[in-house]
Design a protein with these regions (language model features):
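Terminal cytosolic tails of multi-pass membrane transporters
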Residues: 1-26, 422-444, 464-516
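Hydrophobic, membrane-embedded alpha-helices of multi-pass small-molecule transporters
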Residues: 26, 30-46, 77, 163-170, ...
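Transmembrane helix-loop boundary segments of multi-pass membrane transporters
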Residues: 51-61, 130, 136-139, 143-157, ...
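TM-loop-TM module centered on a large, flexible mid-protein loop between adjacent transmembrane helices
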Residues: 94-96, 101, 132-144, 221-234, ...
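Hydrophobic alpha-helical segments and their helix-loop junctions in multi-pass secondary transporters
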Residues: 129-136, 191-228, 294-300, 415-430, ...
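Membrane-interface loop-to-helix entry segments
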Residues: 131, 159-220, 278-282, 287, ...
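C-terminal membrane-solvent junction of multi-pass transporters and transport-like membrane proteins
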Residues: 159, 185-189, 367-377, 415-468, ...
């Protein structure tokens, strides 16, 4: 049965003009796990928690998480339907090219690729931040207050920079030399996230330093912008504006699920398992993440005092708990380990997208970036270039906040683009769908996905993240100029029509190297 499935997957890939170069080693659970790992509610749900809590207090969590989560789920359904039709490593870029044309696909590729690079940067910066605060400070009681440990507005502290660098290098090395181990670790991360999130939620509620749990906190709006929220968000007069901007918590956390698409060529029964892995990763993250972030609010000794902690609110809240020290230490280690595995999966996803764009000659040095190790069946050059770009983007001292918002904005723009193109292509150039077919709900869901995705992208460049907005505008202008100056005539795009037929001999020659 597995052989028939793999032959079918290979046949589908050939029909789109590509050879089976990557090892198809991933099960349906593995495909789910990579997106679930990158979403990692123990990453964004913790490090980005102040975005919402320091905006509108408990309601920003109790109501905001559900609002943002539902929109993310709608986007995942719309993306899943397209992924079922075109299961390639290029993912969004490939879909946009087929449904919206070469230029649309090329622009999508750049937003998606930069978003994925920023994901690695922000996640791995977050890993070090959590390791520093939870393990070194929380477990071993080390003094990590010195400038060398911090990411300042200028050049980051040397210990901070070295720590983030070591984490990124280790992720690249595992992806290069131990892809089988990487897959096992990514699968493990699914269980780790479930176990740690559930344990953390129950422990915080059981050992909350309050006489009784006040559930009204979860729907009580309080304007904590400005100094009241530790300066996380600039002062805002409108509570509605603050609430919408606070959705950045969900935008940053529930993102990166395009990883299921980028590993399509490594997944069994890709047309079925990729869309399922995508929407299930979002759904379970939304549900389990909701209980977890709500427990943060309920377990606080005082909401007003908690908001005043700003970025330190999670460490303050957990330190205030009455849970036994060994349990607290174990949870600290579990949180950091889950975040580390999240970063590992991020490198996998980014390198696959880079490889796919390069094999269509979309990048400088495409020949090298699209090369695949015959022995290991992984795009080795793309792995290390992804890691290098992620590290370089960390050289900006205030990296974490900007990169957190940047990755969310860039990714949601790239999510919206193929879905928007699909609205106009469906029933015209997009006739044959895969097994995951939304039927009559297809266009309504796509329209909601585009609107919701744009809102989630918009919140990412509101103050204090204006720099992200400038990046989006600057990149858009640069890409338009570059397209008309050279890429319009140079870049051929994804294989279509007669080009697919012409590539069949080349595909056969490529696959001979791998003894399939």
């Amino acid at each position: 049965m597995a052989d028939k499935s793999m032959e079918h997957d290979k046949k589908v890939l050939h029909s789109m003009g590509y050879a089976q170069e990557l090892s198809r080693r991933m099960s349906g659970f593995s495909n789910f796990a990579i997106s679930f790992s990158i979403i990692c509610i123990l990453a964004g749900g913790i490090t980005a928690f102040p975005f919402a809590f320091s905006a509108t207090g408990g309601a920003g969590i109790g109501i905001g998480w559900l609002v943002g989560g539902v929109f993310a789920l709608i986007v995942s359904f719309a993306m899943g339907q397209i992924a079922s039709s075109y299961p390639t490593a290029g993912g969004l870029y490939h879909w946009s090219s087929i449904l919206g044309g070469r230029a649309w696909g090329w622009v999508t590729a750049w937003f998606n690729l930069l978003g994925l690079v920023f994901v690695i940067s922000s996640v791995d910066a977050g890993v070090f931040q959590l390791f520093r605060d939870l393990v070194l400070k929380g477990v071993f009681h080390m003094d990590v207050s010195g400038a060398a440990w911090q990411a300042t507005a200028g050049l980051p502290g040397m210990i901070w920079l070295a720590g983030v660098g070591v984490i990124i290098i280790s992720h690249a090395a595992l992806n290069h030399f131990g892809i089988s181990l990487t897959t096992k670790l990514t699968d493990l991360s699914g269980y780790v996230i479930f176990a740690v999130a559930i344990s953390l939620t129950l422990a915080l509620l059981a050992f909350a330093p309050v006489a009784h749990l006040d559930f009204s906190r979860l729907w009580t709006f309080t304007n904590f912008t400005g100094d009241a929220g530790g300066g996380v968000m600039p002062q805002a007069k409108s509570i509605l504006y603050a609430f919408v901007v606070g959705l950045l918590l969900v935008t940053y956390t529930i993102t990166g699920y395009d990883a299921s698409a980028h590993t399509s060529e490594e997944t069994h029964d890709a047309q079925i398992n990729v869309p399922k892995g995508m929407w299930q990763a979002v759904f379970y993250s939304m549900i389990f993440g909701y209980f977890m972030v709500c427990s943060f609010v309920l377990a606080m000794p005082d909401v007003k005092e908690g908001a005043a902690q700003g970025w330190n609110v999670i460490y303050w809240m957990m330190s205030s708990s009455t849970m036994p020290s060994p349990l607290l230490d174990l949870l600290y280690v579990g949180i950091v380990f889950a975040n580390y595995l999240c970063g590992l999966a991020c490198v996998t996803s980014c390198s696959r997208m880079m490889y796919a764009f390069a094999r269509d000659d979309g990048l400088p040095f495409s020949k090298a970036l699209s090369s695949v190790s015959v022995e290991r069946r992984v795009p080795t050059v793309s792995i290390w270039v992804s890691a290098a770009l992620a590290f370089l983007s960390c050289l900006y001292g205030g990296a974490f906040i900007v990169l957190a918002a940047g990755c969310a904005v860039f990714l949601y723009i790239s999510y919206v683009m193929p879905v928007a193109a699909g609205i106009f292509a469906e029933g015209k150039t997009w006739i044959q769908k895969g097994p995951f077919d939304l039927g009559a709900l297809s266009k309504p869901i796509a329209v909601l996905a585009v609107l919701g995705g744009l809102v989630l992208a918009w919140v990412g460049f509101q103050p204090p993240n204006q720099l992200v907005g400038y990046l989006v505008v600057g990149l858009s202008v640069f890409l338009i100029i570059l397209w008309f100056a050279s890429e319009r005539t140079r870049f051929q795009g994804v294989p279509e029509g007669d080009r697919i037929k012409e590539r069949q001999k080349m595909i056969a020659d490529i696959e001979k190297k791998y003894n399939d």
